[in-house]
Amino acid sequence: WRMITQEKAQVIVMTTKEVERGRNKCIRYWPPEGESKEYGAYTLLNAKENDFRDYTWRQFVITKESDPPYKQIIYHHHFKVWPDHGVPSDPGGVLNFLHEINECQRSLKNPGPVIV
């Protein structure tokens, strides 16, 4: 989370499933919806989740007790149907996902880089 705050990133894109074919592919780096979790000096709140057919959209709020206090909203886009090997069979899902990411990034004043 230090890198996210250092770069002032507001958009995270994840294309990996957490588990595929019974194997862990990614460790969950966010708390369940409505809950907070501490990551070192940072506290991350998973404020909201919207689940769609091919992806999940989350809104995080990251804070840090500092002088001055730090608070940032982060948008997490998680594409859930990318296969372990190859590419998705339906490009429409990927294109819709990319459209949502681009719209989100454009709507922010100073979004920083997209973190993938």
Curated annotation (Swiss-Prot):
* Protein name in UniProt: Tyrosine-protein phosphatase 14
Concerning PROSITE patterns, the annotation shows: TYR_PHOSPHATASE_PTP (PS50055)
Per its UniProt record, what SUPFAM superfamilies does this chain match? (Phosphotyrosine protein) phosphatases II (SSF52799)
Record GO cellular component, one term: cytoplasm
| Stated family | Belongs to the protein-tyrosine phosphatase family.
A Pfam family that the UniProt record links to this protein:
Y_phosphatase
Q: Which GO terms describe its molecular function?
A: non-membrane spanning protein tyrosine phosphatase activity; phosphotyrosine residue binding
> Which classification does the entry list for the species?
Eukaryota, Metazoa, Chordata, Tunicata, Ascidiacea
Catalytic activities: O-phospho-L-tyrosyl-[protein] + H2O = L-tyrosyl-[protein] + phosphate
Organism of provenance: Styela plicata
GO terms of biological process kind: cell differentiation; intracellular signal transduction; mitotic cell cycle
Q: Which residues bind substrate?
A: D84
- So what EC number does this one have? 3.1.3.48
| Keyword check for Hydrolase | yes
Domain Tyrosine-protein phosphatase, residue spans: 1-116
Tell me yes or no: is Hydrolase among this UniProt entry's keywords: yes
UniProtKB keywords: Hydrolase, Protein phosphatase
